[in-house]
UniProtKB/Swiss-Prot annotation:
EC number: 3.4.14.11
Any Pfam family the entry gives: PepX_C
The keyword Protease is assigned to this record: yes
Originating organism: Streptomyces avermitilis (strain ATCC 31267 / DSM 46492 / JCM 5070 / NBRC 14893 / NCIMB 12804 / NRRL 8165 / MA-4680)
Annotated catalytic residues: 224, 330, 361
Keywords from the UniProt entry: Aminopeptidase, Hydrolase, Protease, Serine protease
Enzyme category, top tier: hydrolase
SMART domains in the record: PepX_C (SM00939)
Record's protein name: Putative Xaa-Pro dipeptidyl-peptidase
Region spans: Disordered: 423-450
Lineage of the species this protein comes from: Bacteria, Bacillati, Actinomycetota, Actinomycetes, Kitasatosporales
């Protein structure tokens, strides 16, 4: 996804920002493929085809091997009937499906599983860190498929399918940004793969194309909008979809654009649709565009458009397993999206696995490449080929604790995690209060200043400033781990009829983190390449390497949330405020997993507009907080007892050179926004 306010020449849009939207036992590392020798491959494939079956003579296989020719793979295009007429031309829409599959297995008549990425980006904007687009030969068959999935998995006996969402590239129809058209575009392809929908050899012809070569077992994968479509398709409960791997994906489109009425971006889904529409769609889809404007009001009120695009409510329908990946500092598809989806899947007993990085909106191929390819390979082998390789018995969560340093968690959140109510209290100076378990009293007052952001507030946490109210623990005597989603309830009295609120949790103390606010959102792209699969002249499996981009910081914003105070009575509808009247509202903070170390302090900051992350209200309110009716519900591993132990006695400050836990912000840590 691209935030609508980003300049299209921004280098972020050239790569990591799409759409302009127990560890395994030690074993020998398999070699990366840097060359491909077709004759040798053919011999190996023939031998294996003759002697190996899914249950080999010496035991069931644990890993698919690269024994099929990628160079000689079948490459074909099919158009699948979605049974919708989104563009209103009187004909049902067909979506383009580009297929790459092993020729040897086709000759043997063996049915194979499918890995599928359904995307709106294949022609407009490209995929991956190098913004790769599909290319075609003179017959219209795909030559280059973006990313490494086909290069790596086709030689291992999978088919790879790249689907152009309706209204994009070579597909009919209109882009409706996560609605029925988007989801049906991909669902129809799974139906076709399972013999329940019609496919054709051309966009307008009548010659049928049947997917007789597949067993219908499908895994969907994708980052951002692509992963969002995977979430949406899984929420239909479609048969044949066995697993999804959503990366930095949306679970409810309302939560991409709004936070309890507060606008996160300065435009709506119509902008995104227009950006990815094909030229044909632009001439036919005015009605769809108008609906995206009219039914997504800038007031932030919930409408039926958002209900249609809320996949969380349908988590009970999910049949597929879910391997979820998200950056905890993703300020594009914000972390609330993965938190609420994960919780809903857990409540419905869905098999699931999660990776949480310190990055922003970045693919794991670009922040943990070797481990990612290995884990994804084993995941698909287990879920689609049925191999008992132990991936389902590994810890549920991998969490990046420091740049390139990962820990695991058997469950996520860990067993013994409880929501603990932390309460603010007044301190020795205005706006600089305490944070603990006891109910506070008194008030704190601040005035919204849209020129300032969460980093400005954190940098001045120990100063009395007009723009925020800060509440801080003493230096901790032991580590405190937050794992999951927090909620902050505030009771505030505004001076105007409109007001926006922000609440952030901050780890105060020096650290080295991935620089998620840098242009690469935590990675730097290098010039050298490594290869992950087989290549052809038109489709290289070799991709630019990356390294972690780090920053030495004096505070880390670890979770954040926002709301329009006018939505105090309903998360779905705002009303004008009465100046001088107190209102209570709860802000949903993003899911995270973060350890506040011994010697650091934990802070809660409540303020108005968070520059670059929400839009300001129409007025400039001053708000007075009633501290007795303000609190934070924070998921702590070990619960209240862990917090009590960590705060029972003063810890030693982590760095004697730090002024009250924060250095002077002469190099302010930037927040991704319009000017970057």
């Amino acid at each position: 996804m691209i935030p609508p306010h980003r300049c299209l020449t921004d280098p972020l849009l050239q790569g990591s920002w799409p759409g302009y939207l127990p560890p395994m036992p030690k074993r020998a590392r398999r070699m990366r493929l840097t060359t491909w020798r077709s004759p040798v491959t053919a011999v190996i494939a023939a031998l294996l085809a003759a002697f190996l079956t899914p249950a080999a003579a010496h035991g069931a296989p644990r890993e698919s091997a690269p024994v099929y020719s990628y160079e000689n793979a079948i490459r074909e295009s099919v158009w699948v009937d979605t049974r919708l007429d989104g563009d209103g031309d009187g004909k049902t829409d067909r979506v383009a499906v580009d297929v790459v599959r092993p020729r040897e297995l086709a000759r043997q008549g063996r049915k194979i599983p499918v890995i599928m990425d359904a995307s709106p980006y294949y022609s407009c904007c490209g995929r991956g860190n190098e913004s790769q687009k599909k290319t075609y030969d003179a017959n219209g068959d795909v030559v280059r498929m973006p990313l490494f999935y086909d290069n790596y998995f086709v030689p291992r006996g999978y088919a790879f399918v790249g689907v152009d969402l309706a209204g994009t590239n070579r597909s009919d129809g209109c882009v409706d940004v996560g609605g029925r058209s988007d989801i049906q575009s991909a669902k129809a392809v799974i139906d076709w793969l399972n013999g329940r929908a019609h496919g054709y050899t051309s966009r307008t012809g009548t010659a049928r194309a049947k997917a007789t070569w597949t067993n219908g077992r499908t895994g969907m994968i994708g980052k951002s909008w692509d992963g969002t479509v995977a979430n949406g398709v899984a929420a239909t409960g479609v048969k044949g979809l066995k697993t999804i791997v959503p990366i930095s994906a949306i679970s409810s489109w309302y939560d991409y654009y709004f936070a309890k009425g507060a606008p996160l971006y300065d435009s709506g889904p119509d902008w995104l649709s227009d950006y990815v529409d094909s030229p044909d769609a632009r001439t036919k889809c005015a009605a769809v565009q108008r609906k995206l404007v009219d039914e997504a009001p800038r007031t932030g009120d919930w409408t039926s458009l958002w209900t249609e695009r809320d996949y969380v409510k349908d988590a009970s329908k999910v049949r597929a397993s879910v391997f979820l990946v998200h950056g905890m500092q993703d300020l594009n598809v914000r972390a609330k999206n993965f938190g609420q989806w994960w919780s809903a899947l857990a409540k419905n007993g869905v098999e699931r696995k999660i990776w949480l990085s310190q990055t922003g909106h970045v693919d794991p191929f670009d922040f943990r490449r070797t481990a990612w390819v290995d884990t994804l390979h084993r995941w698909f082998d287990h879920e689609l080929l049925g191999y008992d390789n132990g991936v389902d018995r590994e810890p549920t969560a991998d969490i990046e604790r420091h740049p390139d340093q990962w820990v695991t968690s058997t469950l996520w959140p860990p067993r013994g995690t409880d929501a603990v109510t932390l309460r603010p209290g007044t301190g020795t100076q205005a706006g600089v209060g305490t944070l603990g378990l006891r109910t506070g009293s008194g008030t704190e007052t601040f005035t919204d200043d849209p020129r300032l952001s969460e980093t400005d507030w954190a940098a001045h946490i120990d100063e009395s400033t007009a723009s925020k109210a800060g509440f801080v623990t003493a230096p901790l005597a032991g580590d405190v781990r937050l794992s999951g989603s927090s909620k902050v309830t505030v009771t505030a009295t505004p001076t105007t009829s409109t007001a926006h609120l922000s609440a952030v949790l901050v780890d105060l103390g020096p650290d080295t983190i991935r620089d998620y606010a840098d242009g690469g959102e935590g990675i730097t792209t290098l010039t050298d390449r490594t290869c992950w699969g087989a290549s052809t002249a038109g489709d290289s499996a070799c991709f630019k390497n990356t390294r972690a981009t780090t920053a030495a910081v004096d505070y880390t914003v670890l979770s954040r949330g926002w709301a329009d105070l006018g939505n105090h009575a309903s998360a779905r509808k705002g009303v004008p405020l009465t100046p001088g009247k107190a209102y209570t509202i709860t802000l949903d903070l993003a899911a995270t997993d973060h350890v506040v170390p011994k010697g650091h302090r934990l802070a809660l900051i409540v303020a108005g507009t968070d520059k670059d992350l929400i839009d300001p209200p129409s007025s400039t309110p001053t708000l007075t907080l009633d501290l007795a009716r303000t609190s934070a519900r924070v998921p702590l591993v070990g619960g209240a007892a862990a917090f009590t132990r960590a705060t029972a006695q003063s810890g030693t400050a982590a760095d004697a050179t730090v002024l009250d836990g924060v250095r002077e912000p002469h190099t302010a840590h930037r927040v991704p926004g319009g000017g970057l």
